Amino acid sequence: MRVLSLFDGICCGHLALERAGIKIDSYDAYEIEKNAIKATETNFPDVIQHGDVTKEDFTKYKGKIDLIIGRSPCQGFSSSGKQLNFNDPRSKLFFEYVRAIKECQPKYFLLENVVMKKEWQDIISSYLGVEPIEINSSLVSAQNRRRLYWTNIPNVTLPEDKNITLKDILEDIKFPNPAAIRGRRLNKATIVGRRLDENGHRKDTDKTIPITQCLEVRATNTDKSNCLTTVDKDNVLTPLPIGRHPDAFKNNLPFRYYTTKEMCRLQTVPDDFLNMIPDSAARKALGNGWTVDVIAHILSFLPNEYKEDKTND
């Protein structure tokens, strides 16, 4: 299979193709982040890097590409972002993906993005000519990660639930003061900046109140993590009960971030997949990346002609 990957990141698409049993004849990638490129060059030396999608004339690939894959930057659509939709320069990169499809005319395509307002979803669908399928990564990993997938690969269905929970992927990491929290279960939480009055009530519109970083525990269900992002404090573990706990850092509240190895497991990539780049870059790349087993599941519906011949193994 001849593959064109836009906004390639850490090349999760290549790994997913391998897991789906797809024979890769060529893999051309467009990515500008240096650490992501370094990871790809180490893990997949066959990948040809091309740089910035906005500077490419994709007509050179016309008739030469079987599959275009990509996840155009989602911050403009995300509920955790400012939701600027198509006015956000990052979201406008979606149209580079559309341009690539028009210019190289692949047989198949796959685009991933966040769950968004229906009006924006419909705009993307109108350009791609298909409706998306929504898949939560929780079916194949220990992470809640709802995403939309637009593809013309036929007959894609939801993956079976692998029943993977956090206890299956967490390392044995001790808190600084285990005696103080002995016997308590870990709850998933976030650290959020809030403006609180003297009674601890939210007054977010009152700019005279300083922002305090609150550890917020909203549920005791720890079967799945929150969705990974590029911000560590969006996703933490704590033994504290449900509620809002102010001054998380100042009061040295007991919590910990997911380790990079745990984040790899949440995105279903090998533990050592990003050992060659700085830890901070690896964590950001994982927050931006694909859940590989979801992508592999979708790609498994490609026609058998693209799959590795195992008869001679």
Where are these regions (language model features)?
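Conserved active-site and SAM-binding loop architecture
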Residues: 1-313
